[in-house]
Structure formats: C-alpha cells, structure tokens
Amino acid sequence: MPLYEHVFLARQDLSQAQVDALAAAATEIVESNEGKVTKTETWGLRSLAYKIQKNRKAHFVLLNIEASGATIAELERQTQINEDVIRYMTVRVDEHEAGPSVMMRKNDRERSRRREREGE
C-alpha cells in the first residue's frame, strides 16, 4: 500500500484533549477503510506565519499512514468538513521517517536549551 504523511492544523482555542480526539477520529477513518496509521505526533501549539481564519496559532498534528488512495480521499473529505481543522495537507512519500520527525527533534532541542538557561 502507498505511504502518506497527513498534517493538519487545529484551531488554537481547542484543548489538548480535543486535538487528541481529532487525531483519533482521523485514525478511525483510516482504519475503517482498511488503512493503517503507523505513527501519530502532536507538535503542540505553534505560531503561524500569517493569520488563518482569524487564528494566529494552531495545534499541529502529523499522521503517518499506509492506505489506498480512496481511503486518503475519504480522510481529506472528512477533514475538510470539520470546522475545528483550519488547514491540512496530505503528501505521498516513498518511506516513513524512522524515529521522531524533524519538528519533534526541534521541540526537544528547544526544551533542553530552555532548561539549560533556567539552570544557570
């Protein structure tokens, strides 16, 4: 089956539990259409480069998916209908990245630097 990366941005006023529920709903859509979600990453609340639907920040979520094109079409259709999702993008990839994504590594690096500054 083809491999995809699906990233969506959720509104800034949602709680983390609501964002996790959105990710779980996307996983359910994929699995009910005979696909498989291999990894889910929540990158947290991040600033946007420009306002999107009056939002300056958004919760970022990444899903690594193994599924057919029809499954991805259904996932995108359901994502587009959801008012809590302000942007999404699905990209077909040759292989999924092993371990944490670049964004997660960047977040870990920033946290460790912050701890070092506070400890000094």
Swiss-Prot record:
Give the matching CDD domains.
bS6
For this UniProt record, the keywords arranged alphabetically read as follows: Ribonucleoprotein, Ribosomal protein, RNA-binding, rRNA-binding
Task: Spell out the Pfam families in the cross-references.
Answer: Ribosomal_S6 (PF01250)
Tell me yes or no: is RNA-binding among this UniProt entry's keywords: yes
Q: Which cysteines are joined by disulfide bonds?
A: none
- Protein known as: Small ribosomal subunit protein bS6
Q: Which domain of life is it from?
A: Bacteria
Region annotation (Disordered) maps to 97-120
Q: What GO molecular function terms would the record report? A: small ribosomal subunit rRNA binding; structural constituent of ribosome
Q: Cite a single GO BP annotation.
A: translation
Tell me its family: Belongs to the bacterial ribosomal protein bS6 family.
Question: What task does this protein carry out?
Answer: Binds together with bS18 to 16S ribosomal RNA.
Any one GO cellular component localisation term in the record: cytosolic small ribosomal subunit
Basic and acidic residues composition-biased segments: 105-120
